[in-house]
Amino acid sequence: MIAMIATAIIGIVAGGGLGWALHKFFRARTLRLAREEAQDILDEANEVVELRNLEERERIQEIEMELWTKVEPEMLKSEGRIEDLQEVANERKAKADAIVQEEKKKLQDREADVKVQEQALRGQEAELGKLKEAQKALNQELVQKLTERLGTSAEEFKTQLKNQMEEESRRRAARMIQETEADTKEHAESEAKRILSLVIDRFARPYCAERGIGAVNFPDAHIRKLFCDPAGNNIKAVQDACGCDIIVEEGMEMVGVAGFDPVRRELTRRTLERIFKEKKNINPDFIRKIAENQKKELFKNIKHDGDSLAKELKLEGLNAEIRQMMGSLRYRYSFTQNQYFHCGEVGWLAGLMAAELGIDIKKARRVGMLHDIGKSMDHTVEGGHAVIGADFIAARGEAPDVVHAVKAHHFDEQPSTDHAFLVIAADAVSGARPGARRSTIESYNQKVSELQDIARSFPGVTDCFVLSGGRECRVMVNGKKVDDTQAMDLSRKIAARIEEECNYPGSIKVVVVRETVVTEQTRKELA
């Protein structure tokens, strides 16, 4: 059994080794055959590649020959052009060299000419120096001879000549200024007269001159006795209720009213008239009741007057306090001219002039009406009425240009707008028209005295006369001390001094009169 198994094992091992040997043999044989076949294929491929390379080289040679055949004629032509261009360049270079040589020659010739001119110039400069020295010596000799002949030094002569030339220049300038002023004034005055004549013709506002009443007459002796009680309680009651002083003189049949506030004076006057009309038992309680009723009625009238004036001038947006103050001007007078009607006149005149000049008409009327509003409160506030009024309307919303025109209408500040100058002109027209204003003898004498003192304070003035109701100042001067040019300058200085120191309505004409009187006596004796 074991032998059989061993025999089987040996057979299996021997069969396996034989199989492995056969497998290895056939594998080696297959690899050899594959290598031989691959080598054959590689050889064939190399032969094909070599053949193709040969064909490609032949094709390239053919293409090169074909291209050379086409390009060769063009290359030959290009070579011919290059030769032509080279010849042209050579010719141009030769010409340029010739031009350069010619310019060098010209430059050399010019340099030679310059040297010759420099030498000539040096000679002329030397000769000029000699001439200057000769001229200097001649001038010195001339100055010396003139000095000896005139008897003064050169500096003194120069000073005299300078002064003469300055004086002549001043005279010419003064003459030119005079001619220019005459032409300007002639044109300006004619245009102003034309506009004013049109405005005055178009303005026909009704006006009745009136005067403020400062006294109330007693109806009879009985009323006087009732009012003037021994203790003076009635008079004191009127003074306390109305704010004005009551003046009752023995033997006078009237009651005087004194006070700085025109509205309070009017209230006092109305209260007294009402008390005297009642003819009842007059006592302090009755007086206070009458005064209160009259105060309400007066303020109602003031408001109505302010509203009426604003409505008449077609002004809108006016503050209620402004209208109230305008109404209070109904009882304010300046040089006997009622300021309520004066403001209305100025408003209309300013509007008409604005229409002629193409300026805002409504604003001109507004400024004209408001220009003297400060007079309604100048008794309670310090300062000029123009400044007071301007501050008042500025605090109540008026435009800056309106405020400026009100403030500048008496030159409290320099006017700089058209409306400011319009108000100045309209104010002058309203105040200077005949019958508008009157002055007392005391104020007139004071005005005359001030004008004469101002005119006589200037050197050369011999006398002064005030004419035309204080609207003309005629100044007489010494003809030996003041010439024509100085007379013209003197008139301007006097006018400027009057504007600066005096405050009067309207304009004042200054006339300077220079008189030259020449006399000669005959020497021949009569037979």
Curated annotation (Swiss-Prot):
Domain HD as annotated: residue spans: 339-432
Ranges annotated as spanning the membrane: 2-22
Compartments, record wording: Cell membrane
Listed EC numbers: 3.1.-.-
One matching Pfam family: HD
Membrane topology: Single-pass membrane protein
Broad EC category: hydrolase
Record-level GO BP terms: mRNA catabolic process
Family matches, as CDD domains: HDc (cd00077), KH-I_RNaseY (cd22431)
Highest taxon of the lineage: Bacteria
GO cellular component: plasma membrane
GO molecular function: RNA binding; RNA endonuclease activity
Keyword presence, Ribonucleoprotein: no
Keywords of this entry: Cell membrane, Endonuclease, Hydrolase, Membrane, Nuclease, RNA-binding, Transmembrane, Transmembrane helix
Main location: membrane
Entry function: Endoribonuclease that initiates mRNA decay.
Family label: Belongs to the RNase Y family.
Matches recorded under NCBIfam families: HDIG
The name this protein goes by in its record: Ribonuclease Y 2
Organism: Bdellovibrio bacteriovorus (strain ATCC 15356 / DSM 50701 / NCIMB 9529 / HD100)
Gene symbol of the encoding locus: rny2
